[in-house]
Regions:
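Active-site-proximal beta-strand/loop segments in catalytic clefts of secreted hydrolases
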Residues: 3-4, 93, 195-196
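A glycine-rich dinucleotide-binding beta-alpha-beta segment and adjacent secondary-structure elements
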Residues: 55-57, 130-202, 207
Length: 221
C-alpha cells in the first residue's frame, strides 16, 4: 500500500525514573511488582484532562547515571498526553532488517512541561510530612537544583512504558491508514486491531483500551 500515514504518528507514554529517597533501614518490599500506589493528576496545561501519572514504589531503581539507593522509595512518573510524534520506517525491502525508529520524544515543548509538572508533584508528595517517619533523604540532588538540572534528570531518566501507539492511525479522512471499521484503506479484506490504530494515546495504560476495542471489532467482523 502507498499510504503516507503508515508508520507516522508514533508516540508512547514516556516513563521517567530517578526521583529516589534513600533510607537507612530497609523498607518492606511489595509483592505488587514494586508499585504500592498509583497517583493521577492534572498539569497546568491539561485542559481539564488528567495527564500526570506517578507510580510509587519501594524498589528504588533508575537508569544510569542517576543514583539509586539500596533501600528507600521512589516514583516513576509520566506525562500521559504527549504531543511529540515520531515515525517508524522500513530500512529496506528485506523483512529481516531492523526497522528505523525515531521516537522524537520531547520535540514538543509541552511534553517537557508536563514531565516537569509530574516531577514537581512527585517532590510534593514524597516530601510531605507523612513520609518523615521513613527518614528518607532525597537523592540525585545535583539534578534538582534548578529548572535546567531537572530537565536533565528527566532526559537522562527517560524510557518507555511500552504503550506505543498511532502508526496505523484510524480516522474518517483519506489521510488516515484505517477507517472507522478498522479496514485498511486501499487494501481489500485487510483490517488492523491493535494500539497502532489509536490516533491519540489514552491518558491511562493502553491495555484495557485495546482489549475493549478488540472485543468490539470482533463482533463486527
Amino acid at each position: 500500500m502507498a499510504s503516507e500515514g503508515v508508520g507516522q504518528n508514533l508516540h508512547d507514554h514516556v516513563l521517567v525514573a530517578g526521583h529516589n529517597f534513600a533510607t537507612e533501614n530497609k523498607i518492606e518490599q511489595s509483592a505488587l511488582h514494586g508499585s504500592v500506589a498509583i497517583v493521577y493528576g492534572k498539569s497546568e496545561i491539561s485542559n481539564g484532562v488528567r495527564d500526570l501519572m506517578l507510580n510509587v514504589s519501594t524498589t528504588p531503581s533508575v537508569l544510569p547515571p542517576l543514583q539509586s539507593p539500596d533501600h528507600g522509595f521512589k516514583t516513576t512518573f509520566s506525562f500521559t498526553k504527549p504531543k511529540s510524534r515520531g515515525e517508524l520506517r522500513l530500512k529496506d525491502l528485506n523483512p529481516f532488517s531492523q526497522p528505523l525508529i525515531d521516537h522524537n520524544i520531547f520535540s514538543h515543548p509541552d511534553d517537557m512541561r508536563g514531565a516537569m509538572a509530574a516531577l514537581n508533584l512527585s517532590r510534593e508528595i514524597l516530601g510531605a510530612a507523612s513520609f518523615d517517619r521513613f527518614g528518607g533523604t532525597e537523592q540525585n540532588q545535583s539534578f534538582l537544583e534548578n529548572q535546567a538540572a531537572m530537565r536533565s534528570l528527566i532526559v537522562k531518566g527517560s524510557t518507555f512504558f511500552g504503550h506505543h501507539s498511532g502508526t496505523c492511525r484510524m480516522g474518517a479522512g483519506e489521510d488516515a491508514v484505517v477507517d472507522e471499521t478498522l479496514k485498511v484503506r486501499g487494501v481489500e479484506g485487510l483490517y488492523v486491531m491493535d494500539a497502532s490504530v489509536i490516533p491519540n494515546i489514552s491518558s491511562c495504560p493502553t491495555n484495557a483500551l485495546v482489549i475493549a476495542m478488540a472485543e468490539l471489532s470482533a463482533t463486527k467482523l
